[in-house]
């Protein structure tokens, strides 16, 4: 096997002297006979299979904005991000093309190559005005968690994902010989990347175990049951998340206690952060770097017990690390907590790559790493350096407000806004019909009035999107790519740069007064993510041209010689696929 120091240099020792005349003649004769016969033999097929990676590992780091690996580069260890930066292909200018940069949306895009308008995951949840209920992105009442009773809105599966995924296409390409698994600290971070044909496991903040639903299994495999029986979170009970390095070595050493940071139970706002020793311990573990440690441990177990990468065809493993997102939400990207988390994530990646090298071989593994979205700094932090920012609370619409007053004045009713769910306002179409109003007129009026609210930059109605009556400008195109006729809301809101659209009610459900930072906009800080390809035959190079995460799925597909996912709208990255063609 190749070491971490040599993988990516693409050097292969060949004892044959290909420059000698007899060798050249033999090669030409063999090529001529192959062309004349027009047939492939079993050995040809075996040889082709041997050039394919044995394993594809697609890593998603939740909320890893594109600049973060470079920001802390001088502090990184060996074998983690440094391996990707120095021995992989790094696309340094990658941006999502859709407007709602939320977790579920990004994860779906990464594995389908599709925009939300095609894969259908337009938000973390969407509202159905006919039923008056919200639908979670992976909700499926038919499939409850194994070992639990079926409950409304509690079952999960990939049913809502409308496009096939890379893993699905891999399984379809070889009569289901490939195996596909997905692991994450979040359900959506596992279920969506696992696709329809894979198996998904995710961390439960209530039980402290890795769980799955009856969509995947009737009962837990023994190795999963055994691992959960070991009570993996007990090691953190009563312990603390302490700084990995001396405080004076951190860039953000003075950014540890700010009033806008979330303050939750034993976790607190300052180092050392406690995990607690009560009923909330499993929850706190799931919000800190500890969840990435558990995710890595479980992912290694999947590789070992399912023998991924050991068969005759390519297997696929998706791993989504969630801690960066939770830490960013609680403390903000410009915080001591985020810096320490990145250093810990770097160690996690180094451990993972080393394990892959020992078990499958990095020369046999295609590694892909990206993120589901970026993130802004906290508004209060941006205000401290002179930017005009603020927070716009969606719950504002539950109270008398300028928008409801404008509706009352224009249409004689103030009950025309039914609900909100980021980034949408949902209108009360029953009330609109009762009043004899034209829905498109009300939609466009609400959009026009919403722009007058402080912190709102753009608002587009669904009627504008359906009719195609909008300016062909970047923000409008991003909103259009996010629009799905059956799932998108009545009006799509876009906040001013560095303003937040949020809901204090949603934060309250987590026992928090609020969150430090919230993503979900079409602005660059939210769309900007890294894209790395490494291992196998991938060369070391840095690419500065603008690309999109929609390009990842078709690149992997081309690399493996399989068809693109059904909803794909991206293009293969030639810097990666060309190197693969040359080595073949």
What is each PLM-predicted segment?
Residues 24-35:
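Bacterial N-terminal signal peptides
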Residues 56, 171-172, 177-184, 190-193, ...:
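Active-site regions of oxyanion-processing enzymes, predominantly non-cytosolic
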Residues 384, 388, 392-437, 514-560, ...:
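Substrate-binding rim/cap in mid-to-C-terminal beta-strand-loop elements of soluble/periplasmic
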Residues 236-296, 300-301:
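Long, low-complexity, polar/charged, intrinsically disordered or flexibly structured peripheral segments
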Residues 191-199, 273-283, 287, 310-345, ...:
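Active-site His/acidic residue clusters
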Residues 76, 93, 102, 124-155, ...:
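Secreted, luminal/periplasmic, and some membrane-associated catalytic domains
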Residues 69-118, 179-183:
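Short, structured active-site-proximal loop/turn typified by the sulfatase FGly-forming signature C/S-X-P-X-R
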């Amino acid at each position: 096997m190749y070491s971490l120091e040599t993988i990516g240099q693409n050097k292969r020792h060949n004892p044959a002297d290909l420059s000698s005349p007899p060798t050249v003649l033999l090669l030409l004769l063999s090529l001529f006979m192959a062309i004349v016969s027009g047939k492939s033999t079993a050995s040809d097929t075996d040889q082709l299979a041997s050039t394919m990676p044995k394993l594809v590992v697609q890593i998603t780091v939740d909320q890893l904005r594109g600049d973060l690996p470079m920001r802390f580069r001088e502090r990184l260890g060996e074998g983690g991000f440094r391996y990707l930066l120095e021995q992989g292909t790094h696309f340094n200018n990658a941006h999502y093309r859709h407007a709602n940069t939320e977790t579920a949306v990004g994860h779906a895009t990464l594995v389908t190559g599709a925009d939300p308008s095609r894969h259908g995951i337009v938000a973390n949840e969407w509202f159905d005005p006919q039923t008056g209920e919200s639908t979670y992105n992976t909700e499926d009442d038919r499939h409850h968690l194994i070992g639990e009773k079926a409950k409304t809105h509690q079952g999960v599966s990939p049913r809502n994902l409308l496009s096939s995924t890379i893993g699905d296409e891999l399984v379809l390409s070889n009569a289901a010989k490939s195996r596909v698994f997905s692991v994450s600290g979040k359900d959506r971070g596992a279920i969506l990347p696992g696709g329809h044909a894979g198996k998904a496991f995710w961390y439960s903040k209530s039980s402290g175990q890795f769980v799955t639903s009856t969509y995947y299994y009737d009962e837990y495999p023994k190795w999963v049951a055994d691992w959960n029986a070991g009570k993996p979170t007990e090691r953190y009970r009563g312990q603390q998340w302490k700084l990995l390095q001396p405080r004076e070595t951190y860039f953000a050493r003075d950014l540890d206690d700010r009033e806008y940071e979330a303050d939750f139970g034993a976790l607190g706002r300052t180092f050392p952060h406690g995990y607690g020793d009560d009923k909330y311990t499993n929850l706190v573990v799931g919000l800190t770097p500890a969840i990435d440690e558990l995710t890595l441990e479980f992912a290694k177990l999947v590789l070992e017990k399912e023998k991924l990468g050991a068969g005759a065809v390519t297997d696929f493993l998706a791993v989504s690390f969630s801690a960066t997102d939770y830490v960013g939400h609680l403390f903000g990207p410009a915080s001591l907590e985020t810096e320490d988390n990145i250093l810990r994530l770097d160690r996690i990646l180094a451990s993972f790559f080393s394990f892959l090298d020992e078990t499958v071989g990095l020369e046999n593994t295609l590694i892909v790493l990206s993120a589901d979205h970026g993130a802004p700094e906290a508004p209060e932090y941006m205000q401290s350096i002179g930017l005009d920012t603020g927070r716009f609370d969606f719950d504002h619409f539950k109270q008398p407000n300028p928008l409801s007053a404008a509706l009352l004045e224009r249409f004689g009713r103030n009950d025309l806004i039914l609900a909100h769910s980021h980034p949408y306002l949902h209108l009360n179409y029953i009330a609109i019909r009762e009043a004899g109003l034209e829905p498109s007129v009300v939609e466009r009026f609400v959009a026009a009035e919403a722009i007058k609210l402080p912190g709102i930059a753009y608002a587009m109605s669904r009627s504008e999107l359906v009719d195609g009556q909008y300016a062909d400008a970047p923000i409008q195109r991003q909103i259009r790519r996010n629009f799905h006729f059956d799932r998108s809301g009545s009006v799509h809101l876009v906040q001013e740069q560095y303003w937040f659209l949020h809901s204090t009610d949603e934060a309250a459900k987590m026992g928090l007064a609020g969150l430090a930072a919230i993503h979900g906009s079409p602005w660059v800080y939210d769309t900007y993510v890294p894209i790395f390809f490494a291992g196998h035959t991938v060369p070391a190079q840095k690419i500065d041209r603008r690309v999109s995460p929609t390009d990842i799925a078709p690149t992997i597909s081309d690399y493996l010689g399989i068809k693109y996912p059904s909803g794909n709208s991206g293009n293969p990255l030639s810097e990666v696929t060309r190197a693969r063609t040359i080595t073949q």
